[in-house]
């Protein structure tokens, strides 16, 4: 919510900076659960650190969640403090061609959202049948992140 309110970010700059540092830390290894009677419930909406999981090459396990989280960090100005998020962003930008379209190797299907946090965020186009249709969502999100970071974009 703070990421969407620039005036509040400026007024509470110290708090926003501390929050950015907190959200850039790796998430705890131990699962967080809430005890409700005899049942244990794992909440989907609680962020206890950076939820992005990436392999050695920088590919995220949950691409929509990674893009959503990178966008939030970019809006808050906290992306530089999150090493996993910057590694994933660098990997995604490396998969872009010379005109800026995200074209990874072997894209056979739309990347699946594994976390319920991103249901409202991804995909923009549900019926992507062609390879170009599958690339649109990620390309748009990368362009939005680049714009939030203040990078110049050229329309081709």
Task: Indicate where each model-derived feature is located.
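An alpha-helical repeat/solenoid feature that recognizes helix-turn-helix modules
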Residues: 1-85, 106-154
